[in-house]
């Protein structure tokens, strides 16, 4: 029975392939970018087997060029792998590539894509991005969370200090730090279901970052059920939804009674969104689901990506002891004799900033960015990009291109000393947070959760590898997923540092 079902599916897919080929026969004059050979039904999918997507696509681009076409099942896709082509997509023709493709996971976990990251381009997206930039993640709001960051960093330092007799799972502790930091910023306090919630969010992000064959055959709705992915995502999402719904309703109740929700007395992120909901006057009134979608974006961008950046920074410094010593010396000289310091003081640490810049060059949080979708037929470099084409920018490859970076694969923070390259998408060879209209709106929030903990950990502890390990033994293997996190947990031994009081 199962055999006949598979045969039926194959025949049906074959029919769709022939039908699509017939429909597209009148557009053969369109000159698509070059790309690898294609098979019926699967298109270019076989070329993606056997490696991490951003690695495979970089290697294919070496053969087919910086603007490359792939046929992924039913989906037409273009991959950008040079600063010039990235500028065409993210600046010159930004409006034409400002939308997002429809994918299963964001449709579910982002409440029909009513978030910011996966929302299709239009008036609703413009409204919510404006709210995010001016209210939710404004510089003022990010600064208002400084006491929460200070408290969470203190917890992290105290945990490491209590574990100095054995190796610390650096990866695990930093994920818990960024998760707790985001929880308290969003919800105002540590809540009773926080640990369960953090694990559920981690599960949902993992599922959302997985490959689902139904996304490359969007016309075949039954594949979502057949692969089982929809059920897995729905199950985890319902649990997350119930927890956040309770938190929102508790906030509404407290506000109605004149109580503050944040343990520190200020507005948390839900308070901000509820205030805007109650004020009215918006073209698209905010609902509970809209709030939950924005909160999911916050956790997706503020936990996995920040903790991954911290881990990669430490991995690279442990592999390069001279760089570790230089970063540590800077922190300890700047705060000599102090027991602690806050994030305003971290502004003085110029070399630490270079370390983070170099970390993001080699390990951008989302190596292919969130994919864009072509809204109107566009010509780039003499090639036609059809409407609905999925566009991926390989920022991992851009950051390692030897045409633009000397000794591109090696970790050298000093390369940025005399370099004006920044994070905000103006330099197309360096786009760790994207560029154009869809650049990540949470850059300030994310970096604030990276600088302070890293500076504190370098200040308070001397670090070494577990017995028997050498710096060269630290591998750089990445996980498969939306984020390029390190595959193996980083285990380190910490020795408390006693600052001189002279």
UniProtKB/Swiss-Prot annotation:
Gene Ontology molecular function: heme binding; iron ion binding; monooxygenase activity; oxidoreductase activity, acting on paired donors, with incorporation or reduction of molecular oxygen
Topology of this chain in the membrane: Single-pass membrane protein
Annotated effect of mutating residue 482 to I: Increases catalytic activity. Strongly increased catalytic activity
Obligatory cofactor(s): heme
Catalytic activity, as annotated: (-)-vetispiradiene + 2 reduced [NADPH--hemoprotein reductase] + 2 O2 = solavetivone + 2 oxidized [NADPH--hemoprotein reductase] + 3 H2O + 2 H(+)
InterPro entries given in the database record: CYP450_71D (IPR052306), Cyt_P450 (IPR001128), Cyt_P450_CS (IPR017972), Cyt_P450_E_grp-I (IPR002401), Cyt_P450_sf (IPR036396)
The keyword Oxidoreductase belongs to this UniProt entry's keyword annotation: yes
Keywords on record: Heme, Iron, Membrane, Metal-binding, Monooxygenase, Oxidoreductase, Transmembrane, Transmembrane helix
Key word Cell wall biogenesis/degradation present: no
Enzyme class, UniProt record, top EC level: oxidoreductase
Places the protein is found: Membrane
Family: Belongs to the cytochrome P450 family.
Protein's name according to its UniProt entry: Premnaspirodiene oxygenase
């Amino acid at each position: 029975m199962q055999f006949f079902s598979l045969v039926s599916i194959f025949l049906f897919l074959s029919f769709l392939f022939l039908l699509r080929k017939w429909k597209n026969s009148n557009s053969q004059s369109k000159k698509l970018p070059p790309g690898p050979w294609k098979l019926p039904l699967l298109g270019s999918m076989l070329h993606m087997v056997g490696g991490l997507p951003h690695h495979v696509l970089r290697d294919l681009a070496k053969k087919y060029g910086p603007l490359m076409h792939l046929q992924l099942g039913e989906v037409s896709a273009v991959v950008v792998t040079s600063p010039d082509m990235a500028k065409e997509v993210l600046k010159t023709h930004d409006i034409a590539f400002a939308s997002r493709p429809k994918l299963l996971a964001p449709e579910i976990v982002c409440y029909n894509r009513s978030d910011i990251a996966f929302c299709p381009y239009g008036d609703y997206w413009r409204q919510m991005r404006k709210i995010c930039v001016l209210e939710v993640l404004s510089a003022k709001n990010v600064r208002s969370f400084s006491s929460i960051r200070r408290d969470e960093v203190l917890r992290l330092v105290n945990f490491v200090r209590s574990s100095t007799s054995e190796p610390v799972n650096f990866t695990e502790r930093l994920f818990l730090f960024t998760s707790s930091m985001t929880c308290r910023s969003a919800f105002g306090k540590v809540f009773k279901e926080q640990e369960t919630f953090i694990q559920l969010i981690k599960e949902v992000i993992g599922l959302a970052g997985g490959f689902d064959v139904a996304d490359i055959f969007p016309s075949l709705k039954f594949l979502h059920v057949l692969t089982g992915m929809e059920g897995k995502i729905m199950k985890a999402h319902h649990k997350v939804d119930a927890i956040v719904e309770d938190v929102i309703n508790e906030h509404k109740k407290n506000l109605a009674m004149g109580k503050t929700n944040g343990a520190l007395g200020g507005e948390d992120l839900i308070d901000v969104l509820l205030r805007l909901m109650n004020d009215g006057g918006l073209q698209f009134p905010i609902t509970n689901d809209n709030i939950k979608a924005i909160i999911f974006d916050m956790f997706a961008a503020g936990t996995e990506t920040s903790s991954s950046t911290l881990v990669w920074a430490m991995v690279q410094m442990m592999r390069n002891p001279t760089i570790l010593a230089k970063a540590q010396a800077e922190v300890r000289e700047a705060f000599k004799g102090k027991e602690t310091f806050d994030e305003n003081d971290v502004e003085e640490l110029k070399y630490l900033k270079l370390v983070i810049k170099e970390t993001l060059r080699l390990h951008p949080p989302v190596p292919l960015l969130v994919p864009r979708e072509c809204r109107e037929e566009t010509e780039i470099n003499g090639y036609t990009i059809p409407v609905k084409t999925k566009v991926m920018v390989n920022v991992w490859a851009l950051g390692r291109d030897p045409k633009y970076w000397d000794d591109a694969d090696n970790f050298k923070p000093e390369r940025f000393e005399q370099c004006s390259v920044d994070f905000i998408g103006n330099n197309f060879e360096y786009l760790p947070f994207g560029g154009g209209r869809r650049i990540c709106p949470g850059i300030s929030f994310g970096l604030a959760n990276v600088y302070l903990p890293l500076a504190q950990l370098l200040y308070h502890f001397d670090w070494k590898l577990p017995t028997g390990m050498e710096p060269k033994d630290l591998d750089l293997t990445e996980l498969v997923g939306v984020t390029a996190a390190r595959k193996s947990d980083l285990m380190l031994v910490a020795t408390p540092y006693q600052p001189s009081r002279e």
